[in-house]
Amino acid sequence: MKMLNKLAGYLLPIMVLLNVAPCLGQVVASNETLYQVVKEVKPGGLVQIADGTYKDVQLIVSNSGKSGLPITIKALNPGKVFFTGDAKVELRGEHLILEGIWFKDGNRAIQAWKSHGPGLVAIYGSYNRITACVFDCFDEANSAYITTSLTEDGKVPQHCRIDHCSFTDKITFDQVINLNNTARAIKDGSVGGPAMYHRVDHCFFSNPQKPGNAGGGIRIGYYRNDIGRCLVDSNLFMRQDSEAEIITSKSQENVYYGNTYLNCQGTMNFRHGDHQVAINNFYIGNDQRFGYGGMFVWGSRHVIACNYFELSETIKSRGNAALYLNPGAMASEHALAFDMLIANNAFINVNGYAIHFNPLDERRKEYCAANRLKFETPHQLMLKGNLFFKDKPYVYPFFKDDYFIAGKNSWTGNVALGVEKGIPVNISANRSAYKPVKIKDIQPIEGIALDLNALISKGITGKPLSWDEVRPYWLKEMPGTYALTARLSADRAAKFKAVIKRNKEH
């Protein structure tokens, strides 16, 4: 009996250790060990990467976790694990989490990468998550930083999340994030890709301006018949200047909620795809160094509600406004903006028009004439409970409406104070009487758990986001220089010039 008790005394710690060890995960310290471990890891497994620089890491994860038992691959000490050189990550399994990695000092083969291809991190499987990672001026190869990409047999990843990541000083072409459900734009009128149901939240974007249509912060889908159903919320775009489109939303039924756009030289665009929602976003320009933007809207059946616009300068090339409503032909490449709700928004001291009802109209007329399409101006607009206010000596009236479009639309419960309206519509000048209107007929977006009617009826809530509210939990200071200075460092500026020159030559 004494022998058995003694044996049990030895075995018990060993059994405890065996049971606890899987919870602690495996710690890897080389590329080769990382590759081997991810081939063997099971659902619920944890792979921790030791501090260090992992040059030329080619991490391809094909194993899958399960609902409630994801496979997690993370930095042992977030911020002290660097993926550099000819790096790439492919998440081909499902229920995978990548956490706490810093992507920097890359040198991928320029010829091997291209815009609209897989990203530096390419997500091929569903239910995957990228969290608390940093992407800072990675290299000179044109690609997105993160993509959801179709598999070789055309399967579309769904229900993925990108959160609490920082994307700074990107000097290459293509968007920062591309969410794809087709391989290319489908323009024959047929239904595009299936719904994606992704979420991008609590991320930070700040990237320098590039020539042409070079790739903004986020693209969702390719064309108007794709179904997005993605939620983009609680992100901070601070000098996200890559191109004229901060976000290019090219699919249906996406929701943009609670984001902050600070000093961005572009607009948040409903570019293709009807029935999209923008609620409680903040569009702010607080200096006069550049022209800053709000929203540019194409398409129909949108909801634009409870957004706050305060722009110290506006974008001359687009028509100097906070909200642009596109004229043109219905359901075309430059689709007419019509049949939508614009409610409970605040336009405060916009150094431009609050709403431009016919931006770029001459260009749109030329396009319609060349393609034998009917040119129309925005109509069937329901403008309810909006506040227009100026107490600064800006020269613009509230509205730019060269065709008196406003007369074709519905105006209810709006208040305008401070300057001329610019159009002969009945809007109250009694600010004390202002209150948000109640909304009750907006249908929810499938797969997005937001009560749209309740959110809109509250009016604008909260305040603009700050760096501390979106940053990776382990990162105290903003990477790079562009966010705070609107300039790249000298060495990054030189690399940027080389990228632009190379792109022109090819």
From Swiss-Prot:
Known glycosylation sites: 234
GO function terms (MF aspect): chondroitin B lyase activity
Annotated InterPro entries: Pectin_lyas_fold, Pectin_lyase_fold/virulence, PL-6
Family statement: Belongs to the polysaccharide lyase 8 family.
Protein name per UniProt: Chondroitinase-B
Quaternary structure note: Monomer.
Consequence of substituting residue 364 to A: Partial loss of activity and altered product profile
Catalysed conversion reaction: Eliminative cleavage of dermatan sulfate containing (1->4)-beta-D-hexosaminyl and (1->3)-beta-D-glucurosonyl or (1->3)-alpha-L-iduronosyl linkages to disaccharides containing 4-deoxy-beta-D-gluc-4-enuronosyl groups to yield a 4,5-unsaturated dermatan-sulfate disaccharide (DeltaUA-GalNAc-4S)
Modification sites for Pyrrolidone carboxylic acid: 26
Active site residues according to the UniProt entry: 250, 272, 333
SUPFAM superfamilies: Pectin lyase-like
Documented EC number(s): 4.2.2.19
Record key words, sorted: Glycoprotein, Lyase, Pyrrolidone carboxylic acid, Signal
Top-rank taxon, per record: Bacteria
Main enzyme class: lyase
